[in-house]
């Protein structure tokens, strides 16, 4: 797999792609959908994300130690799914993610602290139909470090 990564990087570089722009001065951490519905292997949507959650916990500690903004997202629907739109038709298994259930709560291993935002979303994107963009702009965030298990 390492060879594939190296050849891809070389291919990008030869075409003038893949350069880095660097980091800004006001970063935030966005943790996408590390809720029990996705991190519990017993859940129909779940998998074994122990390694990913552990790495995220380290990132989270660094952001918290630096007193930097941290935002979590979770997918959650009203019990009658009137807020689910066509997405629930596309992905019917999401119907287990009902507001107030344990499955929509953030995994205890990285549980939000008081003052950390939890954005409830209805679709794959953390930005579509949420106030996340406004929240980041209000904090003048210029760099977002994204981790999670259902990012898009």
Where are these regions (language model features)?
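Active-site acidic carboxylates
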Residues: 1-113
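Catalytic metal-binding/acid-base residues of hydrolase active sites
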Residues: 35, 76, 124, 150-151
């Amino acid at each position: 797999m390492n060879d594939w990564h190296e050849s891809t990087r070389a291919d990008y570089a030869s075409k003038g792609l893949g350069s880095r722009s660097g980091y800004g001065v006001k970063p935030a951490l966005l943790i996408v959908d590390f809720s029990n519905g996705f991190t519990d292997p017993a859940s129909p949507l779940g998998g074994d994300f122990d390694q990913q959650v552990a790495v995220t916990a380290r990132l989270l500690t660094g952001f918290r130690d630096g007193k930097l903004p941290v935002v979590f997202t979770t997918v959650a629907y009203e019990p009658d799914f009137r807020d689910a739109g066509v997405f629930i038709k596309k992905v019917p298994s999401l119907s287990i993610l009902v507001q107030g259930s344990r499955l929509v709560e953030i995994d205890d291993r990285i549980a939000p602290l008081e003052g950390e935002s939890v954005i409830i979303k209805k679709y794959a994107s953390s930005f579509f139909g949420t106030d996340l963009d406004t929240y980041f702009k209000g904090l003048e965030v210029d760099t977002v470090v994204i981790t999670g298990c259902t990012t898009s």
